């Protein structure tokens, strides 16, 4: 039996992820008028652009919801965000500037917690506002069915009847007004925004054109650091981790991770830290473009990775980055709770994060411009006395290094012979324009 319902299941309970915006408001009212029994579920994700969460379920009841619930997802979302930092679960970067997968993290939490709440109410059909071209339709599909094996999916935006009647925002606004709700469309922005406590995503409309830069975006978690008229004074901040977990900012310890993330957002946001412009590959392998904000995630990530590089050895760090990139892809694809992702998460949290205890002090300036001012940890394997250029007792001698050079580089002869072979077969040229060793000339001299 198919899990996707193409038309409205009349007379049945349908859970809708209700944001209170025009789209979900019109969808809820339309479903009720057509004979379905809608239940509204609103996720409190700590969205920085949402002022009154309690009002959203009340509006849902006015529009015809059989019941409306507000589900506080902030604690779980911050926990997953910290886990992503511990694992470096980020795969989209441009010139070293990172997208912190804040929307995929939000979908992982929303998709599981809302469907779990629906299941408690005996609601086994789920609808949301994701479209067929995006990533979210697949993320919600996976997380929903992971949480409730009996779940069926109904999306108004895949229903031709709904699209024919209410296919655009103008039609939806008129529909709400005719029903007596006087819903007015908000002023159209040049892009769309989706946000949660971890970050904000700005995309679509004008941002689909690559000649529209970050300068058209009005940040909701930070400042327009690119505007010279915006004053952004430099600021020092100290971040403390204990066993991989952020616990303090500027000497203030937080027992509540949500409050710590909010403060990290405030600190990083004052500088526009963590804002990035990315061209990425969607799940369906088509490229999209987004401008992202994540001031708190960026702040914690910088401090965490500084401690990682000072505490762990080279091979461990290399594996951390490789696993993190793969895990970031799983997260992006809606597979954050799949076994292959859990395996990588466990490895990083068990063997890497557990050793990360210490403090990092940063000086934040404008945007992603910062300096590391100090790094302190009892677990540091950085020992300056081992490599000091000053005279004194040393842990190894010149003779030790001579032996190391000999043993570590026994393959030089083998490498030289391979280069000679490459020249003979025409793979390498002895042209003066190449940066490769002039092995052809060297071979001639050797033979003479």
From Swiss-Prot:
Its EC number is 6.3.4.5. L-citrulline binds at residues 99, 135, 139, 192, 201, 203, 280. Belongs to the argininosuccinate synthase family. Type 2 subfamily. PROSITE patterns: ARGININOSUCCIN_SYN_1 (PS00564), ARGININOSUCCIN_SYN_2 (PS00565). This is Argininosuccinate synthase. GO terms for molecular function: argininosuccinate synthase activity; ATP binding; protein homodimerization activity. Pfam families: Arginosuc_syn_C, Arginosuc_synth. Keywords: Amino-acid biosynthesis, Arginine biosynthesis, ATP-binding, Cytoplasm, Ligase, Nucleotide-binding. L-aspartate binds at residues 131, 135-136. It comes from Pectobacterium carotovorum subsp. carotovorum (strain PC1). InterPro entries: Arg_succ_synth_type2_subfam, Arginosuc_syn_C, Arginosuc_syn_N, Arginosuc_synth, Arginosuc_synth_CS, Arginosuc_synth_type_1_subfam, AS_cat/multimer_dom_body, AS_multimer_C_tail. Homotetramer. GO terms for biological process: argininosuccinate metabolic process; L-arginine biosynthetic process; urea cycle. CDD domains: ASS (cd01999). It is found in: Cytoplasm. Pathway: Amino-acid biosynthesis; L-arginine biosynthesis; L-arginine from L-ornithine and carbamoyl phosphate: step 2/3. It is an enzyme of class 6 (ligase).
């Amino acid at each position: 039996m198919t899990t996707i319902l193409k038309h409205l299941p009349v007379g049945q309970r349908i859970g809708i992820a209700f944001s209170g915006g025009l789209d979900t408001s019109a969808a809820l009212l339309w479903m009720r008028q057509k004979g379905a029994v809608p239940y509204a579920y609103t996720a409190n994700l700590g969205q920085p652009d949402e002022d009154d969460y309690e009002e959203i379920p009340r509006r849902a009841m006015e529009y015809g919801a059989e019941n409306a619930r507000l589900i506080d997802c902030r604690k779980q979302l911050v926990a997953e965000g910290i886990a992503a930092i511990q694992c470096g679960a980020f795969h989209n970067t441009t010139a070293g500037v990172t997208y912190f997968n804040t929307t995929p993290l939000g979908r992982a939490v929303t998709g599981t917690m809302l469907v779990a709440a629906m299941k408690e109410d005996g609601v086994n059909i789920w609808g949301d506002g994701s479209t067929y071209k995006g990533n979210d339709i697949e993320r919600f599909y996976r997380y929903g069915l992971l949480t409730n094996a009996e779940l069926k999916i109904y999306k108004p935006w895949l229903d031709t009847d709904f699209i024919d009647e209410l296919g655009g925002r103008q039609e939806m606004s008129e529909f709400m007004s005719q029903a007596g709700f006087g819903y007015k469309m908000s002023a159209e922005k040049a892009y769309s925004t989706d946000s949660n406590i971890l970050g904000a995503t700005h995309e679509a409309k004008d941002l689909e054109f690559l000649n529209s830069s970050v300068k058209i975006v009005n940040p909701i978690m930070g400042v327009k650091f690119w505007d010279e008229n915006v004053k952004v004074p430099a600021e020092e901040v100290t971040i403390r981790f204990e066993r991989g977990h952020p616990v303090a900012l500027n000497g203030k310890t937080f027992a509540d991770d949500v409050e710590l993330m909010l403060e990290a957002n405030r600190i990083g946001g004052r500088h526009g830290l963590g804002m990035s412009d990315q061209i990425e590959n969607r799940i369906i392998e088509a490229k999209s473009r987004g401008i992202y904000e994540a001031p708190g995630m960026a702040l914690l990530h910088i401090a965490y990775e500084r401690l990682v590089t000072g505490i762990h050895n080279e091979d461990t760090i290399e594996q951390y980055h490789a696993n993190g990139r793969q895990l970031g892809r799983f997260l992006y694809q809606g597979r954050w709770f799949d076994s292959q992702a859990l395996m990588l998460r466990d490895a990083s949290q068990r063997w890497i994060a557990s050793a990360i205890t210490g403090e990092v002090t940063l000086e934040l300036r404008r945007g992603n411009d910062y300096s590391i001012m100090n790094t302190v940890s009892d677990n540091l394997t950085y020992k300056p006395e081992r490599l000091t250029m000053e005279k004194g007792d040393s842990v190894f001698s010149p003779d030790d290094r001579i032996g190391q050079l000999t043993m570590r580089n026994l393959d030089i002869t083998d490498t030289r012979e391979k280069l000679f072979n490459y020249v003979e077969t025409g793979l390498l040229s002895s042209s003066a324009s190449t940066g490769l060793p002039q092995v052809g000339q060297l071979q001639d001299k050797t033979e003479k």
